[in-house]
C-alpha cells in the first residue's frame, strides 16, 4: 500500500477531474466511483480508480480524498489491492506507480 498527502491550489472537484484525465490514458483504467459533499465548512470529494498492472498480474485501486475545510485543498492518495497472494501483498511497485500518476496530474498545483 502506498499513501501520500498533498496540498494543492485547486478545488477538490478539480482534483478528481485532473487525476482521471491522467489515469484515463491507460487502456485498463476505470473511474469506479465518485462522491462529492458540499457543506458550510467546505467540500469533500472522493474518487475511486482502478487500473490493471501486468507486472503484478492484478488490478490496483487508488482512492483520492480531497477536502478544503481550512482554505487549502488537502489531498490524500492511497493505492492498494495490487499485491499477489494471500500472505504476501508485494505489488511490484504498482501502488507506488498509481500514486505517482495522480501526483503527476496535480504537480503544477502543489503547494509547499
Report the location of each language-model feature:
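A generic alpha-helix structural signal
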Residues: 16-20, 64, 103
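Well-ordered alpha/beta subsegment
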Residues: 96-112
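Terminal, regulation- and interaction-focused segments at domain boundaries
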Residues: 1-27, 31
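N-terminal intrinsically disordered, cationic/polar leader segments
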Residues: 25, 36-37, 68, 107-112
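Conserved active-site and cofactor/substrate-binding residues in soluble primary-metabolism enzymes
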Residues: 10, 14, 59, 93, ...
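Beta-strand/loop substructures that line and gate deep hydrophobic ligand-binding cavities in soluble
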Residues: 56-90
Amino acid at each position: 500500500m502506498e499513501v501520500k498527502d498533498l496540498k494543492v491550489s485547486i478545488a477538490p472537484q478539480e482534483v478528481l477531474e485532473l487525476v482521471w484525465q491522467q489515469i484515463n490514458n491507460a487502456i485498463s483504467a476505470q473511474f469506479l466511483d465518485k462522491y462529492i459533499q458540499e457543506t458550510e465548512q467546505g467540500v469533500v470529494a472522493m474518487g475511486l480508480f482502478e487500473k490493471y498492472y501486468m507486472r503484478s498480474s492484478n488490478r490496483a485501486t487508488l482512492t483520492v480524498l480531497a477536502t478544503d475545510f481550512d482554505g487549502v485543498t488537502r489531498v490524500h492518495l492511497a493505492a492498494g489491492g495490487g499485491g499477489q497472494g494471500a500472505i504476501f501483498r508485494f505489488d511490484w511497485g504498482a501502488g507506488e506507480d498509481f500514486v505517482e500518476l495522480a501526483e503527476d496530474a496535480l504537480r503544477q498545483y502543489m503547494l509547499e
